[in-house]
Structure formats: structure tokens, C-alpha cells
Regions:
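Active-site-adjacent structural elements in enzyme catalytic cores
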Residues: 1-163
Length: 163
């Protein structure tokens, strides 16, 4: 269920994501740039906006353990990962050996060895967004690579917000 105060923003974000667009959104760490993690064109656009080398990985954000198990082959998720997700008090990204072949994850999000970094978000807006979109999101800080990550929307540079 989407909280009423987020409904319109989430509706607009999901519409943009479904069209292959890129969004700015609050995450459980900083303000982020996001896109559909299954859309190669959108993922490449995020790299372009950030002026980030393809070799520097982006993480994938999901809203639940069930969504994680659609992105990562459940056999590749060790028990300790479930414990970290359940008990960690801080945002934790875990690198898994391989994505599920059925996940449709854009190949640009996989490391050369096939591994993938995924975080199960606990932040209310990003979790509601993941649940409404029903696909994994790319999550990376809303800054040009090498610059400070914005903790507030107002701190996002015009270069990023206007891209």
C-alpha cells in the first residue's frame, strides 16, 4: 500500500520509469538517480548523466526480500545475507555471485564476473516506489561522479537535475 502523501509522486515516477526514463528520488542513504534496472538504455543514460566509467558498478534497489529473490538466484543467497537484511540497522548493499537468469537485469549492472550488488531498501518512499513499480531500480547518488553526494533535494546540482 502506497502512503497517501507519496501517491502522486510515486505515480509520476512509475510512469517515467515505465517509459524508460530516469528519476531523482530519496533513498535510504542520499538522494539518488534511478531507472528501471531491466532497461539497458536507461542504465546507460544514468552512466552518461553521472559521467561515470562503465567499470564503476551501480547498485540495484529492491523493496523486499521477495523482490531480491527475483533478482538474485535464491541458491546464490547465503543465510547470512538474510540475517544482514533483517537485522542491519544501516543501509547495506550485498554483492551476490550472480543475478537470476530470469530477472531480466540489464547486463550493464553486472560485474565482469557476473556478480551484482543489491540493497533491500528500508526507506519509506523508495520502498513504496519499488513496490509500485514491481521491478528493480538502479540506485546511485544524484551527483556527477567524484562530487559530493546530495543529502537533500536542494543539494542536487543543476547539471544533474536538468539532465
Amino acid at each position: 500500500m502506497i502512503p497517501a502523501e507519496y501517491f502522486e509522486d510515486i505515480r509520476l515516477a512509475v510512469d517515467c520509469l515505465r517509459r524508460g526514463g530516469v528519476i531523482l528520488y530519496p533513498t535510504d542513504t542520499v538522494w539518488g538517480i534511478g531507472c528501471d534496472a531491466t532497461c539497458s538504455e536507461a542504465v546507460r543514460r544514468v552512466f552518461e548523466i553521472k559521467r561515470r566509467a562503465d567499470a564503476k558498478a551501480l547498485i540495484t534497489l529492491v523493496g523486499s526480500v521477495a523482490a531480491l529473490e527475483r533478482v538474485v538466484d535464491p541458491d546464490a543467497i547465503p543465510d547470512v545475507a538474510y540475517e544482514l537484511i533483517e537485522f542491519s540497522t544501516r543501509p547495506t548493499t550485498i554483492v551476490y555471485d550472480r543475478a537470476s537468469r530470469a530477472s531480466g537485469i540489464a547486463p550493464e549492472l553486472l560485474a565482469p564476473d557476473g556478480s551484482i550488488g543489491v540493497r533491500v531498501t528500508s526507506e519509506a518512499f523508495s520502498r513504496a516506489l519499488c513496490e509500485a513499480f514491481r521491478r528493480p531500480l538502479v540506485s546511485t547518488s544524484a551527483n556527477v561522479s567524484g562530487e559530493a553526494a546530495p543529502e537533500t533535494f536542494a543539494a542536487i546540482s543543476r547539471e544533474i537535475s536538468g539532465a
